[in-house]
Amino acid sequence: MYTKNEILELKNRIIQLEKENKTLHETVEFLTHKLFGRSSEKTSVIAGQINLFNEVETESKPSAPEPTLREVANYRRKKFNGQRAELLKDIPHDTVICGLEEDERFCEKCGTSLVSIGREFIRTELEFIPAKVRVIDYYRESYECRKCRKEGLPYIEKSPMPYPVVQHSMASPSTVAHIMYEKFVDALPLYRQEKEWESLGVKLSRTTMSNWIMVAARDWLIPLTKLMHQKLIEEKYLHADETPVQVLMEPGRKNTSESYMWVYSTYAGSQTPIRLFDYKPSRSGNCPQKFLKGFKGYLHTDCYSGYNKVPGVIRCLCWTHLRRYFVEALPKDIKSPEATLPAIGIDFCNKLFSEEKLLVNLTPDERKMKRLETEKPILEVFWSWANSIKQSCLPKSRLGKAVDYAVKNKEGFMNYLMDGNCAISNNLSENSIRPFTIGRKNWLFSGSPRGAEASAAVYSIIETAKANGIEPYSYLKFLFKSLPGVQFEAHPEFLEEYLPWDPWVQSSCKKKA
């Protein structure tokens, strides 16, 4: 027979094992969803859940009589004839006249020659013209003064030449810009570009293309990103994020080691939008501390503790990130009782985001006042709710982690209320880094630290161009055509007029409407 203490101990053990089993079951569900489920974080209304905010829906009366229906005659959807014209207005047009051959222009009744009486429009086609390449051979003209020559003082002058984008190569501004655009915008790896060039009749190896990218980035793009870095530090509101990247041939590290690409962005209302990528071999907090040296202001991030090393900043944490924790806490069966608490957490976040949408067109001061009026009460209820359920949540469960994540970082989640220019989320930074994560799926790794640094510079230029509303390919081509020959090493101020918000750059590289 068991003693009372042994029975009590066994009961406690059973309770502990049940909790562990529940946590493990939840983990298996979560990982299975990660592998095979949809990646969208959109959530539908959960049957039976307590919705704190949809008062109209919860107070409605299903038994109320429906309004009488009125029959509407069938109709055909109206064609919007202007849409096609607007779509094709900036594309060159050719006209094809379909007429009768000379020997067919006769009347079948009497044999008299036919005369054209006009033409009618039939249709429009969009024709695709494959890419083509051409070779440009540069010759330099030399000029001589015949008079000086006769006097024994020969004078010869040679015409100026455009500087090459890559010395001692056949690379042109358009070629290097195209290779970069394909790799860093369209996420097309160099080995696939190699095949494309071969189909055009050019045997251009991926090694050559890689060298062109690194040299062009080193000579023309990195100096510009350094100037952007100086501008970034002067801002008052920044966003930051980081993502893993595998880099080969790092000194003293295995090729399987994980490195990081950090991205720093100005806030949505900045007059000089900047997106800067920074490759570092680690995720240490020393990385943002060094990069953001001199910055004082609001820093939007997730809850990663490494950002705590950045001195003199007020951290604004991301509510989208917190919402993601509650979404991940939803069980597979969203109609189960276990779904109620995560759903309430999601509802709180959704309500905050709904309120934010109403504040987009307000001034910063108006936005701050409105947030304190409408969002702060929601936040107070949220923190009260989170604290009330914290003790009842299994610490290792998804819901327990979500609640703990929120409560431990309450101050950071509330800081966006301090200034109307602050954002409720770090979506801006996540959107900036997304092209890199998409590209990483295709090219998998960087071949060397130099290659990773070049990639960071190219991504910085491309994403900053997008943020400033200009075409990335046009901007790259513009830089490679204009910067060679500019003495910016001796006069760094010369680079100012090549920044993407400069009126000259804007007019030269603007996107087609």
Q: PLM features: what roles do these ranges have?
A:
Residues 1-170, 210, 239-240, 301, ...:
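Short, flexible loop/hinge motifs at secondary-structure junctions
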Residues 104-105, 142-144, 149-513:
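Catalytic center-proximal scaffold of phosphoryl-transfer enzymes
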